[in-house]
Structures are given as C-alpha cells and as structure tokens.
A protein has these predicted regions:
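Hydrophobic packing within well-folded, soluble alpha/beta domains
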Residues: 1-2, 93, 109, 130
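Short beta-to-alpha linker loops that shape the active-site pocket of alpha/beta-hydrolase fold enzymes
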Residues: 6-8, 93, 126
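FAD-binding beta-loop-beta segment adjacent to the flavin cofactor pocket
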Residues: 9, 94-102
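Alpha-helix N-cap/helix-start motif
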Residues: 10-13, 64, 71, 119
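Short, flexible turn/loop "capping" segments at secondary-structure junctions
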Residues: 12-14, 51-53, 102-103
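Dinucleotide-binding Rossmann-like beta1-alpha1 core, especially the glycine-rich loop
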Residues: 18-96
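Helical element adjacent to the flavin cofactor pocket in flavoenzyme catalytic cores
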Residues: 109-136
Length: 136
C-alpha cells in the first residue's frame, strides 16, 4: 500500500534522495537493501517503464578505530550475503579519490554497488507493475 497526497509522487516521494545503499548495521536491513538493489537493476525493463538507476559506488569514512571495527563487521556481513565491500586504508582511499583529504582518517569502506535511483520514476514503475498484475 502506498499513501500519497492526491496522486503518486505528489507528496513526500519527490523529496526523497533516492539513495540505494547496501551498508547497514543489521543483517535484515542489509538483506532487504540488497534485494531492492537487485530488483532495481531490471525493474524498468520488467515493467516497460524508463528508470534512472545508477550504480556509482560509495565510500564511507572512518575517523576512529571503533568506526573501522564497525565497518569490518558490516563488510563481513556483506561478503556473507554476496556483496563486495572492501575495507580501505587511508592510502587506498586516496587511490579511489585522489582529491580526498585523508590525514585524519582511520580508513574507510568502499562499496562498489551503492547507487541512486529517481524516486518518482521508481514509484511510477512499481505502480505500473502492480497495475499490470491487476492492482488498483
């Protein structure tokens, strides 16, 4: 069920950032995000609706040893779920993004499968798929 004001994407949908992360501190949330990202890759084609979905990758930065430990735990969960999440040293981060200032970083996490999607297009594609299957 989707609740919107007056028509689809007229309410809060168009305000959404459209981030499609894999990173999550919870196994269940990571699993749902992984499922969604996989679905978005083919959704436009599956329902014959144009979609702007981009797999851009994302770097998460750690300024402390504790944050790096969290990244290591999350990366382990991700790898177990079939995701590629790489723990990076400050030097490796600099290789990924030469303009990054790394002097105060403990390291980071690189997720090449993070991305973004147009929230309005996503909503319309999901609605079209539902209508095609008899939804109203």
């Amino acid at each position: 069920m989707l609740l919107e004001k007056n028509e689809l994407t007229a309410g809060s949908t168009w305000h959404a950032a459209g981030n499609v992360p894999n990173f999550a501190g919870s196994w269940a949330v990571m699993n749902m995000q992984r499922y969604g990202a996989k679905m978005y890759r083919t959704l436009g084609e599956d329902v014959d609706y144009p979609m702007n979905y981009h797999v851009t990758g994302a770097i998460r930065l750690a300024h402390s040893k504790e944050r790096m430990q969290e990244f290591e735990r999350v990366a382990g969960m991700g790898r177990y779920q079939g995701l590629q999440m790489d723990i990076c040293t400050p030097a490796e981060l600099k290789e990924l993004n030469p303009f990054m200032e790394t002097h105060d970083l403990a390291g980071g996490l690189w997720d090449p499968l993070d991305g973004d999607i147009d929230p309005a297009q996503l909503t319309q594609a999901l609605a079209k798929g539902a209508r095609d299957e008899g939804g109203r």
